[in-house]
């Protein structure tokens, strides 16, 4: 974090913005990192890499979330597979672990985040879920809504359905499942992709997505493409337009206010 904020970002001439890492296994150190680096220029927020054995709703993290929220920054959870996890040791193919792992951990943490009322406790804290694909989102929306309607007393902090909270959060595209275009279109509709989804490439990994993955989707409007490919990120992270063309596009689609 020190290297990024003292060397990389200052030397980038405004071209780089960064999410800083949180040492999530140590809540007190996580808070110190936010307090020390959270106000540095071109820092957009803080990122938690896959948490495997700690609940994101545990009380030890409340001061961390509050500190990020007070600074107007973004909290993100970046998922990833772990073949060393006992349950995943039953998988005998990388394909299986890769398919399940990236989605599974964010499913787990998103469930704990929503059901434990974190969206109500930190209503001004934008939350971003990274590198889990998109297919898990409508699945989890439906499952949590179903369970919540049967047992609302177990989620006393909620003031609306779990899916409504999930539609208020943000998601990265990669790796986007494009095999069934109708299913993908339904996913985009359910998650309010036009305002909540942000393109990510994951380059140079072997399964990276080109910008054309979004631009070539036949069911997206021009505004939706603009938002997903950069407009939403400009609004969320308060990115400054670097030239008049960028400024015109942000203004055209309603994303300039926070960016300029």
PLM features: residue spans?
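Short secondary-structure boundary/capping segments
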Residues: 92, 143-146, 213-215
């Amino acid at each position: 974090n020190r290297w990024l904020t003292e060397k990389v970002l200052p030397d980038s001439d405004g071209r780089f913005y960064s999410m800083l890492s949180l040492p999530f296994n140590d809540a007190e150190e996580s808070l110190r990192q936010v307090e020390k680096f959270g106000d540095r220029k071109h820092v957009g927020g803080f990122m938690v890499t896959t948490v495997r054995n700690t609940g994101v709703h545990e009380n030890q993290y409340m001061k961390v979330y509050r500190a990020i929220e007070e600074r107007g920054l973004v909290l993100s959870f970046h998922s990833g597979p772990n073949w060393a996890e006992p349950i995943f040791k039953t998988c005998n193919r990388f394909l299986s672990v890769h398919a399940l792992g990236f989605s599974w951990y964010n499913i787990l943490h998103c469930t704990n985040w929503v059901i434990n009322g974190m969206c109500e406790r930190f209503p001004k804290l934008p939350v971003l879920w990274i590198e889990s694909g998109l297919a898990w989102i409508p699945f989890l929306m439906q499952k949590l809504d179903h369970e919540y309607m049967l047992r609302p007393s177990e989620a006393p902090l909620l003031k609306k359905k779990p899916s409504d909270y999930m539609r208020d959060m943000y998601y990265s595209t990669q790796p986007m499942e494009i095999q069934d275009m109708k299913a993908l279109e339904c996913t985009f509709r359910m998650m309010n992709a036009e305002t909540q989804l942000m393109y990510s490439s994951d380059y140079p990994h072997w399964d990276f997505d080109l910008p054309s993955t979004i631009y070539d989707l036949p069911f997206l409007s021009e505004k939706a493409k603009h938002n997903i490919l950069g407009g939403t990120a400009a609004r969320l992270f308060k990115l400054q337009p670097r030239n008049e063309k960028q400024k015109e596009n942000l203004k055209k689609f309603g994303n300039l206010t926070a960016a300029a």
